[in-house]
Amino acid sequence: MSTTDKIVYLNGNTLKIEDLINIGYRGYNVSITQEVEELIQKGRNVIDDILKSEKTVYGINTGFGLFSDVIIPPDQVKMLQVNLIRSHSSGVGTPLTPERTRMLLALRINVLTKGYSGITLETVKRAIKILNGNCLPLVPEKGTVGASGDLAPLSHLALGMMGEGKMYDFGDSGNTFTSNLDVDVLEYRNFKFSPANEILKRQNLTPIELNAKEGLALINGTQLITSLGAEAVYRCKVLAETANIITAMTFEALKGLTAAYHPLIHAARPHSGQGRVAAFLRSVLHSDQYPSEITLANKDTKKVQDSYTLRCVPQVHGIVFDTIDFVQGIINTEMNSATDNPMVFDTDELCGTISGGNFHGEYPAKALDYLTIGIHELSNISERRLERLVNSQLSDGLPSFLVNGGGLNSGFMIAHCTSAALVSENKVLVHPSSADTISTSSAKEDHVSMGGWSARKCLNVVENVENVLAIELLAACQGLDFRRPLKTTEPLEAVYQLVRSKVTFMDKDRFIQPDIEEVYKLIRSGQVLNVVNSILNKK
């Protein structure tokens, strides 16, 4: 894969999470090289040879699942593929967003470029034009059991490309839309849907016409799990870094002790993530380079150690970083894996097909369940830090609920309740979906991954964590205001100023939800992380 002038060149081997985010959220188009075209054609030649030989091969001239022993006559092999897509388009629920639909389609194209699916080059080229033209099928998010692949959502994707079902209708915008990863992330977008054939015609595009094996090639794979998982990993990486910054803000508001972050402590327990978090906290808290007036004024404190929610942050946040790194490796591999069945080979050892189980979603399912558990812990500990900010018995001099005139004003009282509610919700959502399996297809497909729900609930938890951390950051800035005129370090002052550019000090009760939303946007868009990095990178 290479990226040039907002074009991602797909080859089935080197696509990265950032590339997929660029395609989904930043409007990058996709293309393939002549070398990839030749690889796709090589795989298709194997299928054409099988058709000429009149051999019986699963998925080419047989039924599917329980009907795999039913032989399909040559004049019906194309209808077999059309029927497959129509019957398998059985999903329900909220449609995937335009961004996630783009990621889903791009990822499916990427695995097809490996040449193991036997799809025609013409179909791949049409799929690329459909993606680049933002002709995005309506894909319900529910309905996959994660083996044999994400059949229902990928069937809806294929159905739209066939000119059936519905597609997003962006009206007079030239079939473009404003993405919501980086700007106005909570802006309501009232998209409508129109018949797929009308959208394709409007863009002067021709629907895909399925040949033998092609319906199966378009739907047999883990691309829903993996594309949603890629977004989850991307957001978790930003979120984990931002959580360290927010922790430091709270640390300063609570007049924490930096001794617990001493490098000798973390060298004695050399987990990668733990050392990484401790080093970061040392880089933004009081130092010769970045002095903190709050820390200097507190140097004669009689306190000898902080609570666990401050003292043990490297140990708690650290494993989250290691979890993200592990899951990223699984997702990157899955993004570039052939997940079709049967798979097509043209080698010295074999020229033909082999039936296998690469479509089984257990790898990304288990990984994303693990990621969900890991990223949730950031909200668990954040809510406890928030309790210390709003509880005057724990906050070293801050007013109850971070507001003057308590009684008449309630301050952050119910913002803390919101945080607690989200954390409680997460504690249910972290139950691993992949611990379950239900036999399907008359016990032919008798073990499944349930990875679709693993991916979707991971994103649900990520959003909850983003909001919990937004509330903590808002409260930490309020706490720092009560420490004025003393200031914190330069990197943390930059975060404070960023927040205050959107949300003013709460001198009395006001409608607080818009404040939370503004800070949520700063976190989700990466602005909090960027403002700190811009200072640290000057060193």
Curated annotation (Swiss-Prot):
EC number, UniProt record: 4.3.1.3
Keyword Repressor appears in the UniProt entry: no
Record Pfam families: Lyase_aromatic
Class of the enzyme per the UniProt entry, highest EC level: lyase
Gene Ontology molecular function terms on file: ammonia-lyase activity; histidine ammonia-lyase activity
Keyword set, alphabetical order: Cytoplasm, Histidine metabolism, Lyase
GO CC terms: cytoplasm
PANTHER family linked: HISTIDINE AMMONIA-LYASE
The protein's name in its UniProt record: Probable histidine ammonia-lyase
The species this protein was found in: Dictyostelium discoideum (Social amoeba)
